């Protein structure tokens, strides 16, 4: 029954969720208008359209989108914090690759996977193996983390990157204040469900997780989910995530070959077919990473426009939604298409 607790899966089934729905029309209005938007009627219209499309999600939506070649940007609730869910695997990858660039870790370095490394949620390692005894390279584990959002691989990579504190410190060193990484995926899921009695990490295994998760009463899980939505840990602002993606694209925070490796893996992402890429024209190139937990559904990435029209960094977060995942995904897809078409046909402000 481990799928009940998936943090990342297109067909996620929320575990007895009854999150408070706080989305209203007022919640979807932009938190503040930038001077750029105020002087650009086209961006103002796009901002209003994003707010309108957001209501489909049934939750609170945050969006930041930047046309990289011109710097034109639109933001709605851009400074509000949202649970990252598995989108936090992007900053983890950045810190991991930073260590690789410094020679502290090697891509071909083999890492033994122990039974205590098999964690709940999305991916394949915990599904295929219930004991340790295998070894995978850092490159393979990073690919599992980003391609299929494998939580076991993620927690091994988080440890290899130096832990949550090192990831957050790297974000601060880049001048990005909006991203906090504080817990492993296993700890994050346990907090969302309301588990308070997990043993020390070296005694973790799939059976331990299953027993602990199934022991939580529905009313306790509901209360834990509400606390989770208000918790500043493992959150990002749309502006913060967009800033990180912009730096990744410009390849000024990693060695060029490391930045390109990260982008290549993100282009091959196998999750979230109905999100950012869901309504984009067939063949549109997008490097992205999704995230899902409870009432949260996210997708962040870089869209390549056709006909040399440039690139768009976009971060879309949905939180506190009681609607089914499909409705949240539809909102993300419609917002992405609106942003795509706007910057394709109006790359510069009208005179």
Annotate each language-model stretch with its function:
Residues 1-9:
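N-terminal secretory signal peptides that target proteins for export/translocation
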Residues 11-24:
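Bacterial N-terminal signal peptides
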Residues 29-49, 53, 226, 230-351:
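Structured C-terminal helix/loop/strand segments within mature extracytoplasmic catalytic/sensor domains
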Residues 72, 128-130, 223-226, 316-318:
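A short small-residue
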Residues 83, 178-254:
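Active-site-proximal helix/loop microenvironment
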